[in-house]
Design a protein with these regions (language model features):
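Long, contiguous amphipathic alpha-helices that act as assembly "spine/axial" helices in icosahedral shell
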Residues: 1-20, 46-60, 134-160
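Alpha-helical scaffold segments that mediate packing/assembly in large oligomeric complexes
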Residues: 1-42, 166-174
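Generic hydrophobic, helix-prone segments enriched in Leu/Val/Ile
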Residues: 14-16, 39-40, 47, 65-68, ...
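Short non-domain terminal segments
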Residues: 15, 24, 28-30, 53, ...
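Alpha-helix initiation/capping motif
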Residues: 25, 32, 36, 58, ...
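Extended alpha-helical or coil "stalk/linker/tether" regions that are enriched in polar/charged
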Residues: 32-57, 66-79
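Generic detector of multi-pass transmembrane helix bundles and their immediately adjacent loops
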Residues: 54-68, 88-92, 133
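Sequence/fold signature of self-assembling virion shell proteins
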Residues: 71-174
């Protein structure tokens, strides 16, 4: 309910760019980047979050889009700023934790996570037991050092409906 799941259709982007001669004129990175940007912009039509969202994705996805080239070999996006402008986001952030994440929907289809658009102003962080913080300290005789550990438990959740977009690649053979 809080997250919009939107599939990226790479084959449709390949067909729209140049029909049957796409591979001769554009590289895979360009096709992939254009498919992601088109999906991101169409998904934003349903976005109900506040402000401008940021894009969180794997470092590999950022590299694929930055390495996209046109027919003459020139890069389409010269910097992360150009790429963020094309995606209509405030900033791009990399998250290695997204690598290999797969969601299985109600019909048992697999969707590989490509990235998440979210404005963290729509995300609320809280804690249990009034924000209880536990402190431990102990003297380590082997190293002649006093060691400290501070521990707390926190939780968080989106607080606005449709305030995040998860771009996914539908696939059943991962």
């Amino acid at each position: 309910l809080y997250t919009i799941h939107y599939d990226v259709d790479i084959e449709k982007a390949r067909a729209e760019l140049q029909g049957s001669k796409t591979d001769m004129s554009f590289g895979e990175n360009y096709i992939y980047a254009e498919a992601i940007i088109a999906a991101a912009l169409y998904a934003r039509e349903k976005y109900k979050g506040t402000g401008t969202p940021d894009f969180f994705c794997t470092p590999h996805l950022v590299n694929v889009m930055l390495l996209a080239r046109d027919m003459n070999g020139r890069r389409i996006y010269n910097s992360k700023t150009d790429l963020a402008a094309a995606l209509n986001v405030g900033n791009l952030y990399t998250a290695e934790q997204f690598e290999g994440k797969v969601r299985i929907d109600d019909e048992a289809h697999k969707h590989k996570l490509l990235g998440i658009f979210v404005n963290l102003a729509d995300y609320t962080v809280g804690s249990t037991k009034g924000g209880e913080i536990t402190r431990f300290d102990q003297f380590d005789i082997d190293f002649n050092q006093q060691k400290y550990l501070i521990e707390t438990r926190i939780s968080g959740a989106l607080t606005r409906v449709y305030s995040a977009i998860a771009l996914e690649n539908p696939t059943d053979n991962i």
